[in-house]
């Protein structure tokens, strides 16, 4: 356990995100350096976030009351999850669903871009923004690998909640939900917008979230990666991925080796050192493949 605690503490983290794990399959060293030195919020990221927010607003209006404390924040996430799941039931689609889980004792958190109800199943869709007119084969293939890891992990986490392997009890114990109390300021805000007293309760809101996920139709083995043109906001392409339990288990075993402290963060291989010129740490904090150019 000390290795686990030290690695998370070193990066200033209390949990591992699905994005962290996926990023290990682009460049594990870059993922680590982003936490050690700070991740730059780029214009591309801003546009991507804008697209996600626009799509979310098409299904429901996020909670407008701003959180003051950690408890308030957790309630806001739970409330928006519940509203997203309600739209899945009513409209057949939900967006921006935050989910939780556990792997080898680590807290795992991820945000599913979209769920869609099909005839007898629920499909997971991951949205990624791209520059449609500036595509390079090697770049696309490398990005596809990490996107595939991410969406397979989402299915694993969602299945775990649906099948009651990761329960409300597990979640509440891990995040200390029972001891959390909403701030008076936040509660007043909830009452102002008409949220009833019985729903202004953090334990109750997550009970409804976990019950709603458990009631979902089976999660489809067909996972969809949908690529959106960053500038127009229109769909550029769509790829169906077949879920593989064997493959995701192997990938998670590799990824957790880093978090367990079994090895240091790995740089890219020589075959993929072209990625380095896309990295802000190249030639500065990381000189693995730097030749002084």
Predicted regions, residues:
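Metal-dependent nuclease catalytic cores that hydrolyze phosphodiester bonds in DNA/RNA
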Residues: 1-124, 135-137, 175, 291
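Non-catalytic, well-ordered alpha-helical scaffold segments
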Residues: 18, 48-53, 148-152, 273-277
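Long, low-complexity, compositionally biased intrinsically disordered regions
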Residues: 1-9, 88, 239-243, 253, ...
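Mg2+/Mn2+-dependent nuclease catalytic core
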Residues: 90-93, 97-252
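Cysteine-cluster motifs in flexible loop/terminal segments that predominantly coordinate metals
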Residues: 6, 20-35, 249-293
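Short, solvent-exposed segments of well-ordered alpha helices
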Residues: 15, 141-145, 270
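Solvent-exposed amphipathic alpha-helical surface segments
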Residues: 58, 62, 161-165, 262
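Short, flexible loop/turn segments with low-complexity composition
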Residues: 67-71, 169-174, 264-274
């Amino acid at each position: 356990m000390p290795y686990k605690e030290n690695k998370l503490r070193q990066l200033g983290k209390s949990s591992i995100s699905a994005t962290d794990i996926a990023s290990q399959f682009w460049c594990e060293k870059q993922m680590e350096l982003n936490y050690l030195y700070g991740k730059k919020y780029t214009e591309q990221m801003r546009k991507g976030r804008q697209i996600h927010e626009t799509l979310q607003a098409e299904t429901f209006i996020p909670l407008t009351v701003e959180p003051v404390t950690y408890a308030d924040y957790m309630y806001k996430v739970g409330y928006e999850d519940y509203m997203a799941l309600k739209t899945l039931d009513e409209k057949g689609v939900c967006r921006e669903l935050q989910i939780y889980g556990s792997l080898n004792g680590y807290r795992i958190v991820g945000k599913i871009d979209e769920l869609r109800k099909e005839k007898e199943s629920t499909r997971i869709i991951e949205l990624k923004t791209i520059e449609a007119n500036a595509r390079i084969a090697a770049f696309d293939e490398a990005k596809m690998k990490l996107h595939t890891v991410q969406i397979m992990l989402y299915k694993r986490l969602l299945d775990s909640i649906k099948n009651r392997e990761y329960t409300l009890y597990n979640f509440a114990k891990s995040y200390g939900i029972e001891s959390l109390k909403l701030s008076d300021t936040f509660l007043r805000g909830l009452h102002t917008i008409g949220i009833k007293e019985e729903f202004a309760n953090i334990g109750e809101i997550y009970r409804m979230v976990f019950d709603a996920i458990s009631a979902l139709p089976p999660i489809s083995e067909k996972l969809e990666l949908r690529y959106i043109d960053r500038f127009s906001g229109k769909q550029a392409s769509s790829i169906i991925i077949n879920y593989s339990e064997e493959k995701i288990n192997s990938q998670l075993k590799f990824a957790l080796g880093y978090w367990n402290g079994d090895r240091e963060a790995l740089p890219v291989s020589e075959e993929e050192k072209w990625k380095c010129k896309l990295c802000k740490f190249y030639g500065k904090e990381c000189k693995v493949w730097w030749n002084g150019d």
